[in-house]
Amino acid sequence: MPERFLGIDTSNYRTSAAIYNAETGEWVNRGGLLTVPEGAIGLRQSDALFQHTVRLHEKIEALPQGEVRAIGVSTRPRAVEGSYMPCFLAGESVARSAAHLLSVPLFTVSHQQGHIAAAALSAGKLDLLDGEFLAWHLSGGTTELLLVTPDGKTVRVEKLGGTSDISAGQLIDR
């Protein structure tokens, strides 16, 4: 079986699906921003969930076809107790169903863990994930300094500091 992996993320402002080929190091990402109504300052979770439900199949169908070895999906904003947003249910539902039908492992991660892995991948430094390092995470309502340590097939994230006001992460997402 080829070393291809499917990743899915349905955060509050973007629907994303990607294929990563571990043999070649190549990846194909099909993502798109959700529509925020003119004059609005954000999206309600119900509206984000609806848009993901309508768009996710289009993102997946735009990926190159072929077998996948496993599926990864973001299921919550952060890997901490009580971290929850309904918009992640769209991606989780599709990923769980696909993993079951294809008889492949499903890896659930937080959106934050996905950002960290995506940054390492896009920098060509996946080996960073094999050791401890510091990372700045700017996303949505957060600007945080994190201690990242390997944890099996994913990473453990400890918040060392961050902002308590409107963050730079909002500027990036909006």
Question: Which residue stretches match the model-derived regions?
Answer:
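Short acidic/glycine-rich loops and adjacent helix/strand connectors
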Residues: M1-R174
